[in-house]
Amino acid sequence: MIIDTTTTKVQAINSFSRLEFLKEVYETIWMLFPILILVLGITIGVLVIVWLEREISASIQQRIGPEYAGPLGILQALADGTKLLFKENLLPSRGDTYLFSIGPSIAVISILLGYLIIPFGSRLVLADLSIGVFLWIAVSSIAPIGLLMSGYGSNNKYSFLGGLRAAAQSISYEIPLTLCVLSISLLSNSSSTVDIVEAQSKYGFWGWNLWRQPIGFIVFIISSLAECERLPFDLPEAEEELVAGYQTEYSGIKFGLFYVASYLNLLISSLFVTVLYLGGWNLSIPYIFISEFFEINKIDGVFGTTIGIFITLAKTFLFLFIPITTRWTLPRLRMDQLLNLGWKFLLPISLGNLLLTTSSQLFSL
């Protein structure tokens, strides 16, 4: 009888241990699932941006874009990525192998961290932090360190010059960008991305920060283009001057990482324009009766979440037409012109905009 009781207790303990183990596995999977969904969404978003840029560029230049890889050439970016994956990874003979290898990873990871605070709905955000927007600025400022490490580790004068240019450009335009974000935080009384979007939803379309901060919006666009190193601000990798800048010695998947980092940065900058200035996930139709008739802003559940994601992405990809068309419209600036624009024009303008915003907030109390 004693043996049977002991056996029953042992079986109960084993069953409890298995249940605890299954619970831990379930919690781990549930924690990783949103991250996997976000990574998948980011990957698809980058592929769509590459395809859009090629199609729009072809249209501007009056030529036929990619058309063989998949319908309408939509799989061309995937084909290029697969090709880079199987290319040989070459290392510079006299370079610093450690810095050369870790540079691209730092650039990509620092940009990816910013996606954690992008809200696609009031409850659809991985990390709703009170310092949300400033966390993005902090982690994005790490990327130029990776570029500088890549340029220095390549032991190539063109690569090193490209890394130095990337660092100088980032420092010059990070400050106006931060001042614009600070102005938005003052208007919304919060630095949380969710709170900033909800503050814009009170008055619909006319409540967007685009109308309350037009100067900050323009400065933010110019600064974000410079941070993404898009034309006319692509001096760190100017082909005519530096071959390919800090990317000169790279090949294979490491070169592909720089390529991906460029489009990741472009996508997250456009997402932040949507969140900070264009009302985020809110539909914000100018005519109030339409939103009330369809009850679009009041829908909860899966359908409401889907609508929020769709609206955020629609605003983001519509805004992407600006940096894509700018690439084939404006000529590249000289280095002195780029630095003068950042320090002598954008910095005073963004500082004045911040002072005006602070004054208006004080007088409205």
Swiss-Prot record:
Transmembrane intervals: 32-52, 98-118, 129-149, 257-279, 302-322, 338-358
Membrane topology: Multi-pass membrane protein
Catalyzed reaction equations: a plastoquinone + NADH + (n+1) H(+)(in) = a plastoquinol + NAD(+) + n H(+)(out); a plastoquinone + NADPH + (n+1) H(+)(in) = a plastoquinol + NADP(+) + n H(+)(out)
Localization, UniProt: Plastid, Chloroplast thylakoid membrane
GO molecular function terms attached to this record: NADH dehydrogenase activity; oxidoreductase activity, acting on NAD(P)H, quinone or similar compound as acceptor; quinone binding
InterPro entries: NADH_UbQ_OxRdtase_su1/FPO, NADH_UbQ_OxRdtase_su1_CS
Enzyme Commission identifier(s): 7.1.1.-
Family statement drawn from the similarity comment of this UniProt entry: Belongs to the complex I subunit 1 family.
Subunit structure: NDH is composed of at least 16 different subunits, 5 of which are encoded in the nucleus.
The protein's name in its UniProt record: NAD(P)H-quinone oxidoreductase subunit 1, chloroplastic
Gene transcribed to yield this protein: ndhA
